[in-house]
């Protein structure tokens, strides 16, 4: 009998737009959310929500909650707005990943799950565009 403890895995969902960075840590099925944090929860000024520093603080907050609940290893899913929005993650994605790695998690795989259309998307505003 080995006395080795089972490593509990989780998934870190990072949504990084130009305006904010949202972090959600869930179990492997994605059904149970273990911890949540965002750039807007950790800074006072609205203009700092999207900053790399806010993303780092949010990742540290989510990481400490997840470590308390026994998650020891993470798979990371990074997402940009996608669709008719930006297809590249915002400025907070890289610092959030780095902060999770420094928090002591074992990092499994990192994948990009940005929704990318295969034909085209009809932009909002209708045929004649947005009238200002």
Curated annotation (Swiss-Prot):
For this UniProt record, the keywords arranged alphabetically read as follows: Ribonucleoprotein, Ribosomal protein, RNA-binding, rRNA-binding
Q: What is this protein called?
A: Small ribosomal subunit protein uS11
Q: Which NCBIfam families does this entry report, sorted A to Z?
A: arch_S11P (TIGR03628), PRK09607.1 (NF007176)
Q: Which Pfam families does this UniProt record tie to the protein?
A: Ribosomal_S11
**Alphabetized HAMAP family for the sequence:** Ribosomal_uS11 (MF_01310)
The family assignment reads: Belongs to the universal ribosomal protein uS11 family.
Which InterPro entries does the record associate with it?
A: Ribosomal_uS11, Ribosomal_uS11_archaeal, Ribosomal_uS11_CS, Ribosomal_uS11_sf
Q: What does this protein do?
A: Located on the platform of the 30S subunit.
Keyword check for rRNA-binding: yes
Q: Which GO terms describe its cellular component?
A: cytosolic small ribosomal subunit
Q: Which GO terms describe its molecular function?
A: rRNA binding; structural constituent of ribosome
Please name the Gene3D superfamilies in this protein's record. Ribosomal protein S11
GO BP: any one term: translation
UniProt key word Protease? no
Top-down, what is the taxonomic lineage of the species of origin? Archaea, Thermoproteota, Thermoprotei, Sulfolobales, Sulfolobaceae
Q: How does it assemble?
A: Part of the 30S ribosomal subunit.
């Amino acid at each position: 009998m080995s006395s080795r403890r089972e490593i509990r895995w989780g998934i870190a969902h990072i949504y990084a737009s130009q305006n904010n960075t949202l972090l959600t840590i869930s179990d492997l099925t994605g059904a149970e959310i273990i911890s949540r944090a965002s750039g807007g929860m950790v800074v006072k000024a609205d203009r700092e929500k999207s900053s790399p520093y806010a993303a780092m603080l949010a990742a540290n907050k989510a990481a400490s909650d997840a470590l308390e609940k026994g998650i020891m290893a993470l798979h990371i899913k990074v997402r940009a707005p996608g669709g008719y929005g930006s297809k590249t993650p915002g400025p907070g994605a890289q610092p959030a990943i780095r902060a999770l790695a420094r928090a002591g998690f074992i990092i499994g795989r990192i994948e990009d799950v940005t929704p990318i259309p295969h034909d085209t998307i009809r932009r909002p505003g209708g045929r004649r565009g947005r009238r200002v």
